[in-house]
Curated annotation (Swiss-Prot):
It holds the Pfam family Pro-rich. Keywords: Repeat, Secreted, Signal. This is Acidic proline-rich protein PRP25. It comes from Rattus norvegicus (Rat). It is found in: Secreted. Residues 1-16 form the signal peptide. Residues 32-44, 68-137, 145-172 have a biased composition (Pro residues). Residues 22-172 are annotated as: Disordered. Residues 57-67 have a biased composition (Low complexity). The keyword Lyase does not apply.
Length: 172
């Protein structure tokens, strides 16, 4: 595939260079020939040649832009240099389809569970409620949950200024 494209590009470049060279030669040759003897010299009018036309005259006129000269080279109308933005020959695999992903739009299939996975609303449980759901509330502040631990309310953190336990050695 690449070899075919490469050779097509090389042929196109070589054919594109040759008619340009012939165009320069044809532009110079009619003006360089002196008029044949017996004809009064005339200034050449625009677009006309001086003297009799060369052999096969009307066919060998200077290249008109956009018109092939003589028999066109083999396959020349098909082998034009690629226009910018248009692929030459078959497009590369996946070529025009590969577009950069639009921001915010997922490319290809969405990830498993994609749009269905919404963040849970605050205060609302997601999915089925746990067994005994509404009854299981976090304990209210100030109310012990279940039986209080042994000696529960008596175990308070030491108040500042009150020493708990024996005083450290070296005290008063």
């Amino acid at each position: 595939m690449l070899v075919v494209l490469f050779t097509a590009v090389l042929l196109t470049l070589s054919y594109a260079q040759e008619p340009g060279d012939e165009l320069q030669i044809l532009d110079q040759t009619p003006n360089q020939k002196p008029p044949p003897p017996g004809f009064p010299p005339r200034p050449p009018a625009n677009g006309s040649q001086q003297g009799p036309p060369p052999q096969g005259g009307p066919q060998q006129s200077p290249l008109q832009p956009g018109k092939p000269q003589d028999p066109p080279p083999q396959g020349s109308p098909q082998q034009k240099p690629p226009q910018p933005g248009k692929p030459q020959g078959p497009p590369p695999p996946g070529g025009p389809q590969k577009k950069p992903p639009q921001p915010g739009k997922p490319q290809g299939p969405p990830p498993p569970g994609g749009p269905q996975k919404k963040p849970p609303q605050p205060g609302k449980p997601q999915g089925p409620t746990p067994p005994g759901g509404p009854q299981q509330k976090p304990p209210q502040a100030g109310k012990p949950q279940g039986p209080p631990p042994p000696g529960g309310p008596q175990q308070k953190p030491p108040q500042p200024g009150n020493q708990q336990g024996p005083p450290p050695p070296g005290g008063p």
